[in-house]
């Protein structure tokens, strides 16, 4: 079996109004920055190895910076990058802090386009240089490019050979760098095509720049690069001239959702984080379809376009089982159903002995499947009570009735997660030492030597933790039998 690899998280925001609008309506021009923080923090489950953000300022004069980036490593990376951004504003007066025009002209990260990334490595490579977003700089605004993504390409070698055959010399052999150079190369060619066109039309100087930025079409860039990408991906990008895009793989392996109103366009890896941050109805949030791209140009015009033909749907099942937050309405019901599916095999395992069985779950992601499992057992128990009552032909004594009505599913919080450690990303002795201390138990939750203990997990990802910590510590409760079940695979 292939080693489990986590998925990253992405977030992108395009403000459609001037910063002054948000200052007046929401009391701060930092509306976009604050919303990006919320989107990233709500997707912290997707990446604890590092985080980064990028920003583009649409209104900047030559000689002024217009593209900004901040990155950090570690589980506190989100806090660190936003603290670094806000450190630029620490010395401002209250008047300056609420002056949107001043912010737009002077302050870094006071822009209209924001992009954030949460990283879990799928390659084993680590270090700040591997933290997204990546930047490709140029003196032409339209040639500046920042990329981030949630992806795992299977043909990196092939892409590397393709771009080196054209004469490029990538500075690193890493998938994101290679994608950055490939997209950047095509972006350069698109800008140069438009430059030649504008020159032929008699334009000069900054008029050429403005014409290029008005006419550039990133769909042309993606149509010449992404067909050669094999694997699952959601790639987000912003240019220095104010275009932004996101594209999804044609198999629909990696997820992306987006929402737009008259104030903002937002995209994220998960639907409920958009609901939480912006409070739209779930029906107004759209899924980015397989092979489809979302574009917002410099003027704020929004469109989607089918860049690659969709292929057989191969959406990542583990995304719905484990990676995503369980607060998505569809994922919540799916995880509950996975728990319900376990009722029959569990009844066989405990020999229908409900009275002497305690049910619990391994926190925290297995909780939803646990609720589904309990609902399934409640249905079974109600059927059992009904059968008992209908078989008692001579009436029911008060004692018999009391016994039947008192029958219940016994559930306890037998397992406690003390500290938030991901043991499957550690190695060797460190991995075992960590696993031994991640979980604890609730003493007295099981009748020793009498009760069966059934514990549900949501996946097989915690194989090391089960072996090194959970089973051993559950045994301290002295149950008659320990049964560990997985909601997926079953």
Which stretches of residues belong to each language-model region?
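Phosphate/ATP-binding catalytic cores across multiple sugar-kinase/actin-like superfamilies
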Residues: 228-231, 334-355, 373-376, 426-449
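Catalytic or ion-translocation cores adjacent to nucleophile or general acid/base/metal-coordination motifs
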Residues: 171-173, 178, 220, 384, ...
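Short secondary-structure boundary/capping segments
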Residues: 163, 251-253, 261-262, 373-380, ...
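Conserved short alpha-helical segments that host acidic/polar catalytic motifs at enzyme active sites
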Residues: 1-289, 295-358, 362-363
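Terminal amphipathic helices with adjacent charged low-complexity linkers/tails
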Residues: 300-316, 361-397
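Gly/Ser/Thr-rich loops at beta-strand to alpha-helix junctions
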Residues: 152-154, 361-369, 460-464
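PRPP/pyrophosphate-binding module of the type I phosphoribosyltransferase fold
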Residues: 432-490
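Short, glycine/charge-rich flexible loops or terminal/linker lids adjacent to PRPP-binding catalytic cores
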Residues: 375-452, 464
